[in-house]
Amino acid sequence: MQHERPTHGMNIPALRRRKQVLDLAEETVAIEVPGLSLFYGDKQALFDIALNIPKQKVTSFIGPSGCGKSTLLRSFNRMNDLVDGCRVEGAINLYGHNIYTKGEEVAELRRRVGMVFQKPNPFPKTIYENVVYGLRIQGINKKRVLDEAVAWALKAAALWDEVKDRLHESALGLSGGQQQRLVIARTIAVEPEVLLLDEPCSALDPISTLKVEELIYELKSKYTIVIVTHNMQQAARVSDYTAFMYMGKLVEFGDTDTLFTNPAKKQTEDYITGRYG
């Protein structure tokens, strides 16, 4: 069941004073970052990041290796909590609620904000059991409900026609591209509100990459999608908005077409034209 998505509590007028924060109406903001710094022990990885992630759009994070793209992405569902010594200063508001509030239910947060990693990671189970894994954890075991969820999620992930006759075969027998789409199906089966994709195509061949990119385009009508990519052509193809990061700082953030054709910062222009990075 999709929950009503509260948008209260966002101080949008104050955010507009920050250069990198999009001028968005309150109801169109999915994730608000009013100023986030992150540390691994004594090392600072993110420096006062401020941006708004638009609802039901695709936002790409680009930048050279080690610039903080994945660190920022993983902050949105607190995956960085799993790293020893990680410490956060600031806030991240998901539909107006600070996910770093003391006592936050992190398991529920990660259901609402699903994540797909660089390398496809299907479980050593059947295709069917991969898709229903999260539902079973929630205590949902009624066969009719699970069957409907499997069909819906696999169709949404553009995989149903390829696997509908072998749902009870091992997911490990799928191709890399099929496995990645299966992982996306597994993620959306629990009905998240946001999808985080950490270089989801870097291990895939060009044809599989195209299928995943087409899927991203289809899914944005229902989900807010944030993608980390080293491939600037991919960012230009799939995203509505793009953020360029460098050495843990947000250099520029805005409409993808504008950022690639008329960047406001020389540092951005140098990166997208291949002068460094």
Swiss-Prot record:
Give GO terms for biological process. Answer: phosphate ion transmembrane transport
The record, for PROSITE patterns, names:
ABC_TRANSPORTER_1 (PS00211), ABC_TRANSPORTER_2 (PS50893), PSTB (PS51238)
Q: How does it sit in the membrane?
A: Peripheral membrane protein
Q: Where is the ABC transporter domain?
A: 31-272
- What does the UniProt keyword field contain? ATP-binding, Cell inner membrane, Cell membrane, Membrane, Nucleotide-binding, Phosphate transport, Translocase, Transport
Task: Spell out the subcellular localization from the entry.
Answer: Cell inner membrane
Enzyme class of the recorded protein, top EC level = translocase
Q: Which domain of life is it from?
A: Bacteria
Read off the Gene3D superfamilies from this record: P-loop containing nucleotide triphosphate hydrolases
The protein's matches in SMART domains, at most eight in alphabetical order, are given as:
AAA
Q: Does the keyword Membrane apply?
A: yes
> Which one Pfam family would you cite for this protein?
ABC_tran
InterPro entries reported for this sequence = AAA+_ATPase, ABC_transporter-like_ATP-bd, ABC_transporter-like_CS, P-loop_NTPase, PstB-like
A molecular function annotated in GO for this UniProt entry is: ATPase-coupled phosphate ion transmembrane transporter activity
The principal localisation class reads membrane
Positions bound to ATP: 63-70
| The reaction(s) this protein catalyses | phosphate(out) + ATP + H2O = ADP + 2 phosphate(in) + H(+)
Keyword flag Cell inner membrane: yes
EC number from the UniProt entry:
7.3.2.1
One GO CC term, this protein: plasma membrane
Q: How does it assemble?
A: The complex is composed of two ATP-binding proteins (PstB), two transmembrane proteins (PstC and PstA) and a solute-binding protein (PstS).
User: What does the sequence similarity comment in the record state about its family?
Assistant: Belongs to the ABC transporter superfamily. Phosphate importer (TC 3.A.1.7) family.
Q: What does this protein do?
A: Part of the ABC transporter complex PstSACB involved in phosphate import. Responsible for energy coupling to the transport system.
Put simply, this protein is called: Phosphate import ATP-binding protein PstB 2
